[in-house]
Amino acid sequence: MPFKGEIGSSLLELQYLTYLDLSLFEGSETSIPKFIGSLTNLRYLNFSGCNFIGTIPYQLGNLTRLVSLDLSFNNFDKVESLMFLSHLPALKHLEMRYTNLRQTTDWLRAINMLHSLLNLHLSGCGLSVVIPPPLSLANSSKSLAIIDFCVNEFSSSIFPWLLNFNNSLLSLNLELNQLQGQIPDTFGNMIALQHLNLAFNHLEGRIPISLGNPFSLETLDLSWNNLTGEVPNLSNFSFIKELRLPMNKLNGSLTESTDLLSNLEVMDISSNSMNGVISDIHFLTLSKLRHLDISLNSFTLNLSSYWVPPFQLDILIMSSCKQLEPHFPQWLQTQKRIIHLDISNSRISDGISDWFWELPPILMYLNLSGNLICGEVQKLPFIVDNFSAIDMSSNCFHGSKPPLPPNITVLNLSGNRFSRNASNLCSISGEYLNNLDVSDNSLSGELPDCWTNWKKLGILNLANNNFSGSIPASLALLPIEALQLRNNCFSGELPPSLSNCTGLKFLDVGENRLFGTIPAWIGENLPSLIVLRLRSNRIYGSLHLQLCHLTSLQILDLSNNSISGGIPQCLSNFTAMASNSGTVEIFDNSYSYLLDPWTTKGWYKDVPYVNIVMILWKGTEREYGNTLGLVKCIDFSSNNFSGKIPGEITRLVGLLSLNLSNNQLTGVIPHSIGHLNLLESLDLSANHLSGNAGLCGEPLPNRCPGEKVARPSINRGSENTDKRVGKREIITSGFYISMGVGFATGFWGVCCSLLLYRPWRHAYFHFLDRVGSWLYVRAVISIAKLQRML
């Protein structure tokens, strides 16, 4: 528990103090007291997380007996030198994690003078390119065992300095730096190395065959680089426990030598370009394996239905791995402690056995999406953890929607064949439910007014079903951020209670039967709204000026309604549309949980949810999801808007699409329309615009300057023009089809008659003989006459 107050000089009375731990001290933002340097008997000093500012006092160099120093997680902003460290000859443990050392230029020199140093932790310090020091500065202790330089800006120039510790280094962490080029073969000289982490860099080339001592290396993490080639034969690394190679460009197949890695606990080779067949032989001796991720490759799994694995997995991720047989993997029933199971997009076209629904109650994540799994879901696996997710989308499940586990957080049943009435939604009681997606099913009936059962529901997607009736007022009692009800049969008006959903960012009720005017409370009470889609309803009336208060709005679709009146000039208040920058992620609709907490690298798993919106783009309706944050558009088409196009709309320079077609707009196109230089789609057709003599280009008759004419202009009068038009109207695709059919009918009609009817065939060949004889006689006579004449 942190404590507060000030560090008083009364500490000086403790002249024999050897151990001082003030970590997480919540004092005022001041510098480290200089008098600490007078406690010369100190051997342990911990000032981590104390919010100290300024610089590090050089008086700390007086603590010549200090063995351990921790200054991590402070707010130093004026550290220009670390030379005080050179006066600490007994220092063995130094931690300055996430301390701002960007202005420090002598840190390497100071470190090299710590002859007793064993553990060095400088992660997140802003350290950058290192020039190899002169030999005179080389560390003389040769005892440094642990180096943690993750989250810095080191380039590959750091490698030569590391070679000073070939015989002593046990753990090296260079994750999240700027390393480039190939991994040097000299890593093979680090005979004591047990843990090597080069993840999240820009390394390329092949993985060296020699990486440390094969009899000592326990963890190897090369994930998120640009490594190519095949995974080398690791059969000699019999002591390796964790092998992480995801997010590279590795190819080739997985050699059967992996079965020799009997100590392997974690194998992650996901998101590469590997292929080949994986059979039970690959796992023959991997009895300690707990984490297996081979997803997002091109593997084919050939695992027998009767196979009994030698391991008990906690985590299994086989997404996009094709099953040699499209059956549900029966061997999964042998796994009794699995917490994360992902077999999505695996071409499984089978039903699920009853044993599957009795999985151990420790499951946190289940993903069966993107298969062809059929059958009714009697119940979902019981889940204990309060942060858990089930994704069974894009399958062939049918029947009524199954009851929910009480502690589920995310449930995605979209893209199935669930039907029945919507009344059973009231039977769901999920205190922790945050995300519910049952879109693209055949659910019907009126939505029950029982949404108070979910206290934390933030995302609700009921799109593309057959729901009817009015939108329940109790939806407004949810902390909802995204509400998708498009393409149903909802009627009535938007419930006024939705004005209480002040955190709403995504509202899509398009393609329904809603009527009434657009309520003013949308602009007044929903300031966070980013997507507003009311397309294809029965909405009428004019636009309220309060709509212009939606400064975060990026997508506004009011098309195919009966809205009238003028387009408000205040649309220029849409600040997000007036910016020419976008965000890749509109919402942070993901949740995290600790995945694989038992390994040396426990990490959090993000379970994202992508909001989908349908946008009419260049005449075609398109689906946008992952890139939705980059789209900015206004669609007012097919309404009854009148008056002029306001010039203020041209201030929305971030617009990519503007559709005002099929209205009653008049006047001229604003001269400043050219300011919309990011615009990719502009449709002003089917209006009554006038005074636009400067418009040119297809399909208008006026050609733009420098525009090439598609066909030559030939002035032969209206008669010739009509003939050419008539010819084009005759020679159509139907003309060519008729010609082909006629040729085939005539050709085979004659040939079949000659082949099948003997008298006709004999008569035909007799005719050919007579014609041939006649031609021969005529040729002989003509030649004879020609000879007489000569």
Task: Give the ranges of each region predicted by the language model.
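Plant-biased, solvent-exposed loop and capping regions
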Residues: M1-L790
